[in-house]
């Protein structure tokens, strides 16, 4: 079963729960004393054969002087066949106890939490019940912000997004209109500012002139057939260059036109430039290149799953220039089938001894 959300409160009356001490109720060194103060309680009784009706009546009897609004108890079975109970309790006012055994049913001790999202907690309890018991009527907690207030805040935020002309101006307007949110959620506003006002793609400036490779028998042919001209509707082949360091490979490749450049790791979190003519994969071991067939094979659309971001679909259809040194030769890390596929989708070239992309003086 999915884990229960216990983050922000949906309304009034949220409380805090401290981890329960060990079964004997004794507080061991380094362990916090148990304390619960809340209007909404969520209980889980593992490996408990008591019926929901019996459990509910016992809990209701225990809370008879506490102005209890609502109780819901459900029974579920784990994959091993053992039953467990979920209980949700709603009271009129904040309930407080420092006894970790307050909700014990006979010898069965529950996990106790303050239900900070009452409606979500109740929905969780009702997800897959084998049987259930209910008492009273659940009262949805009041939302702290009225619809009018929410509409006003949304309107203000839309105006900020429409009128801001830069990241700094956007953040300044947010700070002025929403000072508390700006203080506690600055990182989120910075993220949205970067999304609204991304950095323009940087134009690469080569540190020195590179050798003209248009007459090279292998590289020149690739430039002409796969980069400068190509047949529409036909996936283009990539270029793989393996050779020593300090031969000018990177500077030459980056001077060919607008491109995506990845060194040491492929980062799909960066802004995707739809004007890029090719991708450059520089000094990245084969095993660390995600979607390598999609990139090398110039597939038109790629579905990527960045490590710290959401899965997304990006347009591609452009070839790669892959640059490696001999100690990271991709072909040495591939299976026979992968090598065959690679040769079918990329022009492979190993620099000859003394060959360089740096023009002679």
Curated annotation (Swiss-Prot):
Q: How is the cofactor bound?
A: Divalent metal cations, possibly Mg(2+) or Mn(2+).
Q: Where is this motif: RCR-3?
A: 124-127
Give one Pfam family, short name only: Gemini_AL1_M
Catalytic residues (UniProt): 124 (for dna cleavage activity)
Which cysteines form disulfides?
none
- Which parts pass through the membrane? none
- Which keywords does this chain's UniProt record carry? ATP-binding, Covalent protein-DNA linkage, DNA replication, DNA-binding, Endonuclease, Helicase, Host nucleus, Hydrolase, Metal-binding, Multifunctional enzyme, Nuclease, Nucleotide-binding, Nucleotidyltransferase, Repressor, Transferase
Query: Where along the sequence does the record place the motif called Nuclear localization signal?
Result: 307-317
Cofactor(s), by name: Mg(2+); Mn(2+)
One annotated GO molecular function: nucleotidyltransferase activity
Top-level taxon: Viruses
Q: Name one GO cellular component term.
A: host cell nucleus
Where is it located? Host nucleus
Locate the motif RCR-2. 84-86
Q: What is known of its domains?
A: There are 3 rolling circle replication (RCR) motifs. RCR-2 is probably involved in metal coordination. RCR-3 is required for phosphodiester bond cleavage for initiation of RCR.
| Stated name of the protein | Replication-associated protein
Which species does this protein come from? Chloris striate mosaic virus (CSMV)
Organism classification = Viruses, Monodnaviria, Shotokuvirae, Cressdnaviricota, Repensiviricetes
